[in-house]
Structures are given as C-alpha cells and as structure tokens.
Amino acid sequence: MSQKKYSLLYPDTNAQYRTLSDVTMHDLGMDQICKKLSAKEREQNYIQNVMARMYADPAVTQYRCDIFEDVLQQKKMRDDLMEILERISFLREYGSFNREYDESACIWDLLHRLDELNDYIKCVDAIHTCLAASDIHSAGFLGLKAYVEKIYADNGFAELKKDISELKMDTSQLKSITVGINLNDRFEADGIGLISVNSKYFTKSGILGNFYDHIASKDRINEDTIWKKNFKFQPFDVNADAVISTPMQKVMDTAVMRSESRGGIVKLPEGDQAKDVTRYTDRIVNHMISHMVKRVREVLNKYVSITITDMTDLIPELLYYIKWAEYIQKLQEQGFTFAKASAYKEGENESDPYMMQARGIYNLKLAVFETEESGNIVPNDMDFDRNRRVYILTGANRGGKTTITQAVGQLFVLAQGGIYIPGKAFTFSPVTGIYTHFPADEDKTLDLGRLGEECKRFKAIYEEADSRSLLLMNESFSTTSFEEGYYIAKDSVRAILHKGMRTIYNTHMHKLAFDVEEMNEEQQKAEHTDGKAFSMIVHMKGTERSYQIEVAPPEGKSYASEIAQKYGVTYEMLVK
C-alpha cells in the first residue's frame, strides 16, 4: 500500500539546489512581493522559501512551469482544489492524524477517528474527480492524477473504504443503553450496571409521572429484574431548580464506574455529578461491545500509516501555485503582460549553459507597487550567451539601472520557481544561484567602513559563486574616491570574466565601461573563458529618462548638468 511520496515542486527529490540568502531576496524585492500573495505570514514564508531554493536542473524548472500553466488556465480546478484543500487542512490541523494513538481510547474516540478517515476518503475522491474533469497537460498534474488514481484503486484503500462502511453500519445501530440501578433501604443508589445495548432510541412517555408515581402504584413495580423491552422513559433535567431531590436523581448524579468493577455491577463513587454519566457509559459500552471496540482498533491500527501525511504534504505545494496564479491573473486583468518561461535542456542550443533571451521584460515591482516609474513601464530586451557574459551598465541617476538589474534577477527567481515572468518571452539556462552586491545598510558597515564591507562581501560572493551563477552588482565600490573605486571595480570585473558567470554591473563609473575591450583582450590572451564584457547604456531623450537599455558604448557624461537644471541649482539659476 505504501508508495513513493509525490511532489508538485520536485520531480526528483534528490535534485541539488542552493538557497538564496535573505539579503538577495530583499535586494530583488522578492520578499515584499511574496507578502502580496497571502495575508497569512506562514503562507508568505513558505512561498518565499520555495522561491529561494534555486534548482539548476532545467527539468525541475520545466516541471514547475508546466504545472503553473495548468493552474493558471484552469480556474475551476483551482477553486475546487482550494475547497478540498481547506477540508484536508482542517483534518490536519484539528484532526487526530497528528496525535499519538491512544490504545485506551473509548469507542466514541475511535469512531471519531473513523469519521476522520472517512472524510479523508471523500477528499481523495474529490481530488480524483476534480483532476479527471480538468483539461490538464503538465507532467506534474498528470502524475498527480495517476498517483491519486493509484490510491483510489489501491487494494488497501478499497479495503479501508469497505471496513469503514461496515463499521459505520455496525456502530450506527447503537441507539441506547439500558442501565440497572440497585437501591439500599434508604433508597440510595447502591450499585449500577449495564443491562443491554439497544438498536432503538428510548422515547418520552406521555403517561408516566415522576418517580413517586412509579413507587405509589404496585403495578408499576416489577417483581423481578427481567426487562420487559419497554422503550418508554421519563426524562429529567438534573440542573433544573424545580427538580425534587429524589433517590433516582441521586442515582443519576453519581454515575461513574469504579476501576475495580466486576461483572457489570459497580459501586458508585461519591461527589461526582450527572455530567459524568457519559464517561460511565463510555466504559460500560466498551465493556459490553468489546468485540466492536476491538474491531475498530484493528482497522485504525491497520491504516495508521496510510497516505494521509503524503496527501496533506501536497497542500502547501498546491497553495504555492494557486496563490501565485490568483495574483498573476489579477495583474493580467489590470493590463500587465506575463509569459511562461522556457528552460533550455542539455543538448539544445549547443548546450549553452549561459544562454538567456529575455524579450519585453520589466521589473515586477512596477506592477505590484505604486512607484514613480509604475505609470510608464518600458519593456526591455536582454541576452546572455557564451560570448556575452558581463554587462557594464551605465546611465543617468534614477534612469532605471537598478530597476532593470533587479528585473533580471526576478526573472530567474520566478522562472525557476515555475511562475510566469513579467514580459513577453524568457528562454534561458537555469542558474545555480543568484548573488547580489548592493549597497549595505549604514549600521552594517561601522566596523570595516563601507568600502571595507563591500570588499569583504564581494570576496565571499566570488568564492561561493560558480560559472553558472548570476551576479548582480549595484553601484559597487562607489563609496570611495573615483580612483580607488575604479581600481577595485576593474579587478573585480577581470575576476568575474575569469570565472565566467553571467553578470550585470550597473555603475556611474563610465571609464569602467570604456575599458571593456581592454579587459576582453586580456582574458582572450589568458584563455580563461570565451566570455566577454560589454557596455550597456540606459538611453536619454534629451533631459528625460527613456528607461530603454541598449548594448552600446557609454555616452561619457555624468548627466550632472541635466540634474542641476532640473532642480534649479546651476550657477545662473541660483544667482539670477
């Protein structure tokens, strides 16, 4: 009955991954974006943790992308699965599956567990029906469908359904119990015992009076202890003020069996209240129908390791796709463009492990958050390949350099997480990891100074990254003098070319971009890699930012005059 655990995130549970740091997720804005997907912190954290795990295997990426496409396009399936998941989640959170099994549990507890198993069966049936009726194409969902069908048709599962059905039929016949109470000379309860377990309910008598009516009439007092199979009874409320304290009430107020009971007749402990009657009946029913209790325990023990846990483990995985699908669909309805990513497999495109073709891409934060640039989103194209490995990105301040740098990082996080990317198309070779070298917070640079902290952090990143990593640098080494910063930056780019990782380095040091040919020639002579660095610029339209990028030589000016004119701080504007 046992089978391999199924996952909608990992086609191969042994696949290797690297986890992005919290700093990287923050630098890319993914931590804030994940918070938009759910109001529940636990779900936010789960989604972010899934996205932070970077699997370089293109099979994992394609597996996820195909699943997400099914979820996004099948809204009814999405809604139905959410409803089923809520039911399964309730069983997991409040049911007894996650509790230790108590061998001393009474029949009522056992039947409650049986009801939970029955609810689980209904959930599996519902998932089976939902998947069978949906137009799904992904290997992940087709595999899940087969997995559920295997559970659905499994001999053990079918037997469980039969066992539960039979047990429910047996236990449903438990309608009432008949209790015998002995009285002493003072009409006090002297002993109580179970006479029978009945398949009929007792019904309220319209002609019997209270206890005194019973003892006042001789024909109401039986001459023996043989029950006459009369299912009429006189109910009472032990909490009602009007109830007279009678010997019968005392009997009902003290109905708990002592552990030393034998033969079905027990002495009554003092001080217990009528609320303990249920506990008493638990014990006497267990005693009288021990064969049924034994049977229920056998069934529960037999199926204690059934695939409930495996199915409940799918809940957060499905939730991951559903939450993203709901949010992406919401943004699509607002007019934002999204597309399914495609991962290159080994053997395709000459197995270029550095390939990336991005078309019409933009920063997801522009769609999620209201910013200065949100009203004017400019899509861009960018390529990486075996030759184009490093981009030195220059342009005006607030011209969009950081925005596009973040966007490229987001593309890989989203695509390798299976989620549609913001843009028209994205074909790529997955990265082993993403590393960001953005300006650190001031309080983190007190010991080493800002430049010292940047150097230490870059060295740690460089040592951990490999040729298939993605490195994103944002104004690195710009916190010191131009000469010092340029010297460190140039050596860093040379080292990056030596390792061969895909890199975007946005900077205001235009001289660094001018020197790419020199660095490329040096690398070619050393024959370290065939990758090269290229200058990339953010275009200007006069004094206006275009946010459009292009591979081109740096324009060679700092745009300080345009900024000064915009804010009125030129000499002429200040002294006029």
What are these regions (language model features)?
Residues 99-100, 293-300, 390, 469-470:
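Glycine-rich, often proline-containing surface loops adjacent to acidic residues and nearby aromatics
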Residues 270-301, 308, 315:
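Extended, charged coiled-coil "arm/hinge" scaffolds of SMC/Rad50-like chromosome-maintenance ATPases
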Residues 112, 306, 310-313, 450-453:
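Alpha-helical initiation/capping and key positions within long helical/coiled-coil segments
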Residues 1-204:
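Conserved amphipathic alpha-helical "coupling/scaffold" segments
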Residues 179, 325-363:
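Long, charged, glycine-rich C-terminal linkers/tails
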Residues 188, 194-278:
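Structured, charged N-terminal subsegments at the starts of enzyme catalytic cores
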Residues 351-576:
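ATPase nucleotide-binding head domains, primarily ABC-like/P-loop NTPase cores
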Residues 305-332:
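Low-complexity, highly charged intrinsically disordered N-terminal segments
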